[in-house]
From Swiss-Prot:
Span of the signal peptide: 1-34
Effect of pH on activity: Optimum pH is 4.5 with LNB-beta-pNP as substrate and pH 6.0 with PA-lacto-N-tetraose.
One biological process term in Gene Ontology: carbohydrate metabolic process
Regions crossing the membrane: 1086-1106
Result of altering D320 to A/N: Does not affect the affinity for LNB-beta-pNP, but exhibits significantly reduced kcat value
Catalytic activity as recorded in UniProt: beta-D-Gal-(1->3)-beta-D-GlcNAc-(1->3)-beta-D-Gal-(1->4)-D-Glc + H2O = beta-D-galactosyl-(1->3)-N-acetyl-D-glucosamine + lactose
Membrane topology, from the record: Single-pass membrane protein
Active site, renumbered: E321
Entry protein name: Lacto-N-biosidase
Ranges of biased composition (kind: Low complexity): 1044-1061
Length: 1112
């Protein structure tokens, strides 16, 4: 069953993606049509308080003009032929964002239009990527010296106009990037990142004017001496060519990397002859033996295979962490090789550097420039690293960035502060800290600063690493990187801070949101519910319950066993089952409703997530979320190195790379009738009711009949409305019902159940439920943070982390140079509102590990009127509350007495004692806090009924046809005369008027008369035939058509009895009114009773009435 097509644009199917994928404008409203009612074009007078919507990166140096310009009816995107594709793309995009029909055109622009202009004479001013915007009486002008410059200008136009404001202030700006390279590392190394994800990632980069992506990945090896390396993950040449083509269209340079001579396990695991052996003879598949000419040749062959696929002028060889976890002392053969190759006194570092230089020479012969990570630069005796190699600096050990500047190397800033990792919690880009602490492109790892204007500093990038990859799905990564991507965009293009704080920038980037490609991507193309999936019969006959997950996948539950489908067993890379031919299995169902912060269940949870994609002929593909291979019914003919040792039996379901399967990887999903519910916010308090969306789905092959959705809430909760009735839902469609729910007195966990019943009979058809958590308090605004100390050297753990609403970050007391001792405290200003009091303090310990959580704590509260800031408070008085916390990472709450001051207050949370590294060990002297907050009593609001959708699909009953009449020019008394070769148009009218008006037409003799589906009659040959119109339920009416030759005078249209002389009856006046040439099957004119008799004979005398339904 396909997902209901009436979903609102930009809403990502599942509640948590709606509520959260979330941040970052993922759910920004589709249209902005209500934002402006002004006429399109320029106005000399701007509306009062009109401001220019923000863009990311910012357009600094804006010069205000006079007046304003409005996008509206009649606005076009006008360009030359050379920019026609850009114009069409922008027009389509703005149409969807604004609900204004915008066309692309070539020719001259008017003041209503957006014009795109390519002006090569602006190259000196704008460079290769810059653009100029002019907003005024000539419309909105986008000018670039290059195609990409114009394209980047359209990105800013789109961002401004997608935020709900269609009137822009007049003005002008010219902007170009501060740095040449602005982008990201995307490591599809060992595990696969889907091509869908890469496609969306490129769209996001383009929207942010980012132009560089380093892609560490495997192009499927196909040479005789490399094809044993075709283990998963890999990409085919067609895969790569498609996303490289898109990247080039966006001005993005995609640079491939095969890391060497370290991190080579996915290339060398089946080639032991190329692996480096240690002094004991043990080989390591991660290490290429650079002393072996055949191993070096193998690497160069891999480089050759990438020829003709990528368009970049660069090659990246990695060159990092060759000896990670060991040292050259364990590989004495490299010392011997170095001395032989590079002379007396040479070291393994010389051999390592010589290998890099050799690869540099090899790729230069191909017209490419080499790039490496900075830990490829080591101290040497006899060999110097070539100066034309670009150094991407990520790691502070070894040679310092300033030394490399002095030596004249070209540098890119790839600091670890801009890293994400699926498993390593320390690698989470903290955009707020970086922005607020004035990080810039000259700030290298460890805070080492070089001149940000160094002429060989190419720019900076973020890096997205997999590591132990089961901790996050790629969709969770997509959500996580939103802020950091926008931060690096701002820092590398504009190198400025036009927002006073990160919170100000964050508000704008959330309002701008994602570009169109990401908003339009359908993560869950079928509704949650029960489905028959016959192709899975080798696992279970089902049926299967599909449950949507917060990150846009499905959990697939076998309703027979109660267990869930998982891809859990098989050989792995980075802790993910990458084995080609691995078989899915049924396991106990994990809770997939939780997010990535629940790390202890990540492996069970994420191996039960499946990506379903719509494919051809109404069928679907199914992929494990972590592996991105395809489930398929094995044929026994698949070819892959993994299948040489483990091959699934033909007819069983297993995972295979997409290029190894075809129609055997297509699945039929036949839906049962069902119901599901999602909630906007699971946390509810009397001041903040939550909206529940109930979706009722019809089976794929049957309408539902009229149904009613009725909620049942526990005591202490209220819900409106009391029920929602839905008209019969057409087969394969879904309808929506909305409910608002709030807790009045209830607290803690609660379940709201929904019953689906047949409206007429009351028969129960199904149930569903949502889980909520009720609180009678709410978080209050916190500001003006302070702490007794904070650690920013050993790790980045400032006090602001305890108030950033992110459980994955934390504040830590200072523990380096020197460490601070107990007691430790954090303080902040709490603002519950005038006349209100804070009621409690909540504390959450760091979530990555338990290494000494708070044990004995005290809370102090003073009126904010007593001091100008937290730092100015000199007398905190006595604690208003104390508590003993258990040894746990769970949220702890401390109730406060009613004697504290009302209104704004300063709060100090003091940790006097801490637990040890274990529950029984001695207490530690440090402290850490993930989240600290004050709560206040929630003031109840009146619960209202939500407006119900007006576009739910429904089956409408139409009256049965009771009769039909046929009319047309020349028709009289049910008869029509035509000359051979002529035509006539007949019309059928079904009674009653609101019955189905569709009829079928037929001729009793096609050799005499033919009739088409519209009722058009053609006279073919001399003779008589009947033309009949028949309704869907069998009612019919006919016209007798007589065809004559051209010279003939038409005779009677039906048989007549000869009359005897003197026996003719006088003509009498009809007792009923003639039917004006129309013949009715229900009350015919007495003059045509003979024809009526003939009609009934044709109709067969027995008509079965069928109720006609239509879907609207």
């Amino acid at each position: 069953m396909e997902k209901s097509s009436n979903r609102r644009f930009g809403v990502r199917t599942v509640a948590a993606i709606v509520a959260g994928l979330m941040v970052g404008g993922m759910c920004t409203a589709m249209t902005a049509s209500a934002a402006d009612d002004s006429a399109a074009g320029y106005s000399a007078t701007a509306p009062v308080n009109l401001t220019r919507p923000a863009t990311v990166p910012s357009m600094d140096g804006w010069t205000d003009g006079t007046g304003a310009w409005t996008l509206g009816e009649g606005t076009r995107v006008v360009s030359s032929d050379a920019l026609a594709a850009r114009a069409q793309s922008l027009a389509s995009e703005l149409t969807k964002f604004t609900d204004v029909d915008i066309k692309a055109a070539t020719g001259s622009a008017t003041g209503k239009d957006i014009s795109l202009t390519l002006d090569a004479s602006k190259k000196a001013e704008l460079g290769d990527e810059g653009f100029k915007l002019n907003i005024g009486s000539k419309g909105l002008e986008v000018i670039g010296a290059t195609d990409i410059g114009v394209f980047y200008g359209t990105r800013s136009v789109s961002q401004m106009l997608r935020q709900g404001q269609l009137t822009l202030p007049a003005g002008t700006v010219a902007t170009k990037p501060k740095y040449k390279e602005r982008g990201a590392t995307l490591c599809a190394c060992q595990i696969n990142i889907s091509t869908d994800w890469i496609d969306r990632f490129l769209s996001d980069m383009a929207d942010l004017r980012l132009n560089y992506v380093l892609l560490e990945m495997k192009l499927k090896p196909e040479e005789d001496n490399t094809k044993k390396a075709a283990t998963w993950s890999y990409y085919t040449r067609d895969d790569v060519k498609k996303f490289v083509k898109k990247a080039n269209n966006y001005g993005i340079d995609v640079i491939p990397e095969i890391n060497s001579p370290g991190h080579m396990n996915v290339w060398l695991e089946n080639y032991p002859e190329y692996q480096l052996a240690d002094n004991s003879g043990r080989k390591d598949p991660n290490k290429l033996d650079i002393s072996n000419p055949e191993a070096v040749k193998f690497y160069k062959t891999l480089i050759d295979e990438y020829d003709g696929v990528f368009t970049t002028k660069y090659w990246h060889m990695g060159a990092d962490e060759y000896m990670i976890g060991t040292s050259f002392d364990n590989y004495s053969k490299l010392k011997t090789f170095a001395e032989k190759q590079y002379g007396a006194g040479a070291t393994p570092n010389d051999a390592f550097t010589g290998f890099i230089n050799d690869i540099d020479k090899y790729v230069k012969a191909k017209g490419k420039q080499l790039r490496i990570w900075n830990d490829g630069i080591v101290n040497t005796k006899n060999v110097s690293l070539n100066k034309d190699i670009v150094i991407e600096y990520w790691y502070g050990a070894g040679r310092k960035p300033q030394e490399l500047v002095q030596d004249g190397y070209t540098l890119m800033n790839a600091t670890q502060a801009l890293y994400w990792s699926r498993s390593a919690q320390v690698y989470k880009v903290n955009a707020a800290r970086l922005y607020n602490n004035n990080w810039n492109v000259g700030t290298f790892d460890g805070g080492r600063q070089i001149d940000k204007n160094y002429d060989k500093l190419t720019g900076a990038k973020v890096s997205i690493w997999p590591d132990s990859s089961y901790f996050q799905t790629e969709n969770e990564v997509e959500k996580e990187i939103f802020d950091g991507m926008r931060f690096i965009s701002q820092m590398t293009w504009s190198d400025s801070r036009p927002w006073a704080t990160w919170n100000d920038m964050k508000a704008d980037i959330d309002k701008i949101g994602y570009p169109l490609d990401i908003r339009e991507y359908d993560y869950t193309p079928v509704d949650a519910g029960i489905y028959d999936i016959p192709q899975l019969k080798s696992i279970s006959k089902g049926p299967w319950e599909l449950i949507t997950t917060p990150d846009g996948y499905y959990q697939m539950k076998d309703t027979v066993s109660g267990k869930c489908l998982a891809l859990f067993t098989g050989s792995k890379h980075l802790d993910v089952v990458t084995q080609v031919g691995a078989r899915p299995e049924l396991r106990n169902c994990a809770d997939v409703s939780v997010g990535q912060d629940q790390r202890n269940t990540a492996n069970e949870r994420n191996t039960q997530k499946w990506q379903i994609r719509a494919d051809k002929d109404g069928k679907y593909t199914i992929s494990p979320a972590l592996t991105q291979q395809r489930l398929a019914i094995a044929t026994g003919n698949e070819q892959n190195i993994d299948l040489e040792t483990h091959r699934p039996a033909a007819g069983t379901v297993a995972q295979f790379p997409a290029d190894l399967v075809s129609d055997n990887a297509l699945f039929t999903l036949t839906g049962h009738m069902g119901m599901s519910a999602t909630v906007d916010s699971k946390t509810v308090n009397p001041a903040s009711p939550s909206k529940i969306t109930v979706k009722v789905r019809a089976a794929s092959n049957a309408n539902t009949g009229d149904v009613t959705v009725t909620p049942v809430v526990p005591e202490g909760w209220e819900i409106k409305p009391g029920s929602v009735s839905l008209k019969s839902i057409p087969a394969g469609k879904a309808a929506i019902a909305y409910f608002n729910v709030v807790n009045t007195t209830g607290t803690g966990d609660a379940t709201v159940q929904f019953k689906l019943t047949n409206t007429k009979t009351g028969e129960e058809l199904g149930t569903t439920s949502v889980a909520l958590t009720g609180s009678l308090t709410k978080d209050v605004e916190a500001s003006d943070y302070a702490a007794s100390s904070q650690e920013t050297t050993g790790e980045h753990a400032p006090v602001g982390n305890a108030f950033d609403k992110n459980a994955n970050t934390f504040w830590h007391s200072k523990y380096s140079n020197p460490s601070a001792n107990l007691p430790h405290w954090l303080a902040f200003k709490a603002s519950p509102g005038e006349g209100n009091k804070i009621a409690a303090i909540t504390h959450l310990y760091r979530q990555d590990k338990l290494n000494g959580p708070a044990k004995n704590v005290a809370v102090y509260v003073v009126a904010a009127s007593d001091a100008n800031s937290v730092a100015d408070v000199t007398n905190w008085g006595e604690p208003v509350a104390t508590a003993e916390f258990p040894y746990t990472k769970e949220l702890q709450t401390i109730a406060l007495p009613n004697t504290i001051p009302s209104g704004d207050v300063y709060v100090k949370f003091q940790i006097n004692d801490a637990w040890g590294l274990t529950e029984t060990s001695a207490g530690v002297t440090w402290a850490a806090v993930a989240e600290l907050a004050a709560t206040a009593k929630a003031t109840p609001v009146e619960l209202t009924e939500p407006e119900q959708p007006k576009d739910n699909p429904e089956v409408t009953e139409t009256p049965e046809a009771t009769g039909v009449t046929v009319s047309g020019d020349g028709v009289a008394n049910g008869a029509l005369s035509l000359k051979k070769g002529t035509t006539a148009q007949l019309t059928a009218k079904v009674a009653p008027d609101d019955a189905d008006q569709a009829v079928t037409w037929a001729s009793s003799d096609d050799k005499v008369v033919t009739v088409d589906k519209t009722g058009k009659v053609t006279a073919v040959a001399k003779g008589v035939a009947k033309v009949t119109a028949t309704t869907a339920n069998g009612k019919s009416a006919s016209v007798t058509v007589t065809v004559t030759e051209d010279s003939e005078v038409p005779g009677p249209t039906g048989p007549t009895e000869p009359t005897k002389p003197g026996t003719e009856k006088p003509t009498t006046k009809p007792t009923t009114k003639p039917n004006d040439g129309k013949l009715s099957a229900t009350g015919a004119d007495t003059a045509v009773l003979a024809t009526i008799a003939a009609l009934f004979a044709l109709a067969g005398g027995a008509v079965v009435a069928v109720r006609r339904r239509s879907v609207r």
